[in-house]
């Protein structure tokens, strides 16, 4: 069995880890960095850039550079959270045929968020393969604990498009707890994992216990907000800068994608700087121009001002902590340790808010950028048998049930139920003689079905006609270890049954996924061919240069016929290098090598002939030389 790699697929950055010698290890990417920006860009010449390369060119290519797409994955275009982002990103968010939120390039090519995420996963996969020296096909990928079924399915689809068999979807706070607690001694304890990342927020209350020599990680409760993270903090800074500039210059920079991208980079840098300093300056020369000439943005930002701008966002993260503790039946004093995960937790105000709520300082010995990937690798190690004596008991973050008469949401599996799990409930018909029922599967906490997330609808037909209330329809829910749901409905009298693995109305169809897998595979083949073409061109360029140097140096020593053949072959190769036909370039290179060989041989023969003549002359002179006799001279005596 090959390695099962662990991937933290983040909103802002992603991280890769493996198990080596029984311990987790973060793997550096090709740029030597331990995290990779979750950014994908499409260039004018059709090249796809991922990570740091995509981030570097974002300012000059804002409409084709996609970041923070994790906030769109598994979501509908009409969702309030998606609508909020429409005017705040320089790229276009569009509606797919099934109502999902997709993105579009400047030339109107529509892309699913899963496709963008798959590009990041492909880079992670390639990084692992380069490090391990073997093919990698299996992975454990993390998601926010509060991701619903659609978002989990979409993340698995992204893995599939990238050529990865996703062995397990694991919640980010749980992964961080695994990374933190695996080697810790000190008996049973309860910990809180506060995970404020680039685009999502989770909090999980987890009990770590020794049970029969096995370390058990049991999630007691989880809560969160899948649209709260560092991106929202950045946006507050961007809004402030835009408003200040508008007051000063009367120009709204929100309408300029290029300016918006520069502002995003500057806002992120300023926010990071203010975690370690009290004041910073945002200086963006030539941010825009009007009839009077170019305009420059220069605004001072203090830590106090930043904290005022994001105060409500920080407070918004505390309420889920209160709910999670309540769901776990615990008080803050019952929590022994608080772990901070996610880059946004480096902000002093966030750390202070967490310390104030839990009544204790959060631990600083956990790397907030790497803990989640390390935990995913540990889970991969457990599945592969490389890590022993670890049991992970996770929970479903939201209640699951069906719509019943009157639009009521009837829960079958309550939130924070340990998974995997199964539950059944018996229902009946609402009308006399009813021969079929529609099962509408939902996820959420509202009493009214219409306010919860619709996951699927399916029909159970062939029910024997009977007065209302008599037929016995057993609806069973089965959640696997990935938190993905399977539902069945069975008529207990006729034993007719309908089963479905819940595939939300949102999400990609199998044919769409297969097409994207094929596209990704074709792109990998395309990249390989591109590399081969570049190598052929580089070899040809070197050959052209060395041949021209040989003509210049030795051309006079060989016949004009040889030079003519070489020049003709050179011209053919130079023409081939301008094209994209690798085989043509290689063939013309081979021809030039063969033709130029006579030039090199003639030049070598000329050299040897010259050195032979020089040797004979030297030898004659040597014979005339008389060896001198030397006497040692001591002092003045000669």
UniProtKB/Swiss-Prot annotation:
The record ties this protein, via InterPro entries, to: ATPase_NBD, Chaperone_DnaK, Heat_shock_70_CS, HSP70_C_sf, HSP70_peptide-bd_sf, Hsp_70_fam
Q: Name one GO molecular function term.
A: unfolded protein binding
CDD domains per UniProt: ASKHA_NBD_HSP70_DnaK-like
Q: Which UniProt keywords apply?
A: ATP-binding, Chaperone, Nucleotide-binding, Phosphoprotein, Stress response
Q: Which residues carry this modification: Phosphothreonine?
A: 200
**Induction remark:** By stress conditions e.g. heat shock.
Disordered: annotated span: 601-624
What the protein does? Answer: Acts as a chaperone.
Hey, which family's this protein in? Belongs to the heat shock protein 70 family.
Entry protein name:
Chaperone protein DnaK
- Recorded source organism is Xylella fastidiosa (strain 9a5c)
């Amino acid at each position: 069995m090959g390695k099962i790699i662990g991937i933290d697929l983040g909103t802002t950055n992603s991280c890769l880890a493996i198990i080596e010698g029984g311990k987790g290890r973060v793997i550096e990417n090709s740029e030597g960095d331990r995290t990779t920006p979750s950014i994908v860009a499409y260039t004018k010449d059709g090249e796809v850039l991922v990570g740091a390369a995509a981030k570097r060119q974002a300012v000059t290519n804002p409409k084709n550079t996609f970041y923070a797409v994790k906030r769109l994955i598994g979501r509908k275009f009409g969702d309030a959270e998606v609508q909020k982002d429409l005017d705040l990103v320089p790229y276009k968010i569009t509606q797919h045929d099934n109502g999902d939120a997709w993105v579009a390039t400047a030339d109107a090519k529509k892309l699913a968020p899963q496709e963008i995420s798959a590009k990041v996963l492909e880079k992670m996969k390639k990084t692992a393969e380069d490090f391990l020296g073997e093919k990698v096909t299996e992975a454990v990928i993390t998601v926010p604990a509060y991701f619903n079924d659609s978002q989990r399915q979409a993340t698995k689809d992204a893995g599939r498009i990238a050529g990865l068999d996703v062995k397990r979807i694991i919640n980010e706070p749980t992964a961080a707890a695994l990374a933190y607690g695996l080697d810790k001694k000190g008996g049973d304890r309860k910990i809180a994992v506060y995970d404020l990342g680039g685009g999502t927020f989770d909090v999980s209350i987890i009990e770590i216990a020794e049970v029969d020599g096995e370390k058990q990680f049991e999630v007691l409760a989880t809560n969160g907000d899948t649209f709260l993270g560092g991106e929202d903090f950045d946006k507050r800074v961007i809004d402030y800068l835009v408003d200040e500039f508008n007051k000063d210059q009367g120009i709204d920079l929100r309408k300029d994608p290029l300016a918006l991208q520069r502002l995003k980079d500057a806002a992120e840098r300023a926010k990071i700087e203010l975690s370690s300093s009290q004041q910073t300056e945002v200086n963006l020369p030539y941010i825009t121009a009007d009839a009077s000439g170019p305009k420059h943005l220069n605004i001072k930002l203090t830590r106090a001002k930043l904290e005022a701008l994001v105060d409500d966002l920080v407070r918004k993260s505390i309420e889920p902590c209160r709910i999670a503790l309540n769901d776990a039946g615990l008080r803050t004093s019952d929590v022994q340790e608080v772990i901070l995960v996610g880059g946004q937790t480096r902000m002093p105000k966030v750390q202070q808010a967490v310390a104030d709520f839990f009544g204790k300082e959060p631990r600083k010995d956990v790397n907030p950028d790497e803990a989640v990937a390390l935990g995913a690798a540990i889970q991969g190690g457990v599945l592969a048998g490389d890590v022993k004596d670890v049991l992970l008991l996770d929970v479903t973050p939201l209640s699951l049930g069906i719509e019943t008469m009157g639009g009521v949401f009837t829960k079958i599996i309550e939130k924070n139920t340990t998974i995997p799990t199964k539950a059944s409930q018996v229902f009946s018909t609402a009308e006399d003689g009813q021969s079929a029922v529609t099962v509408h599967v939902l996820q959420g906490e509202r009493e009214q079905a219409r306010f919860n997330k619709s996951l699927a609808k399916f029909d159970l037909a062939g029910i024997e006609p009977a007065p209302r209330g008599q037929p016995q329809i057993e609806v069973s829910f089965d959640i696997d270890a990935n938190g993905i749901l399977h539902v069945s409905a069975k008529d207990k009298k006729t034993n007719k049954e309908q089963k479905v693995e819940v595939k939300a109305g949102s999400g990609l169809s199998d044919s769409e996924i297969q097409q994207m897998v094929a596209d990704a595979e074709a792109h990998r083949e395309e990249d390989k061919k591109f590399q081969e073409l570049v190598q052929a061109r580089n070899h040809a360029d070197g050959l052209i240069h060395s041949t021209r140097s040989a003509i210049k140096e030795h051309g006079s020593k060989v016949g004009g016929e040889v030079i003519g053949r070489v020049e003709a072959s050179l011209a053919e190769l130079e023409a081939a290098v301008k094209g994209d036909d690798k085989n043509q370039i290689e063939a013309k290179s081979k021809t030039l090598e063969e033709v130029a060989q006579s030039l090199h041989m003639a030049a070598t023969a000329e050299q040897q002939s010259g050195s032979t003549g020089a040797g004979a002359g030297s030898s004659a002179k040597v014979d005339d030389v008389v060896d001198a006799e030397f006497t040692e001279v001591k002092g003045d005596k000669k």
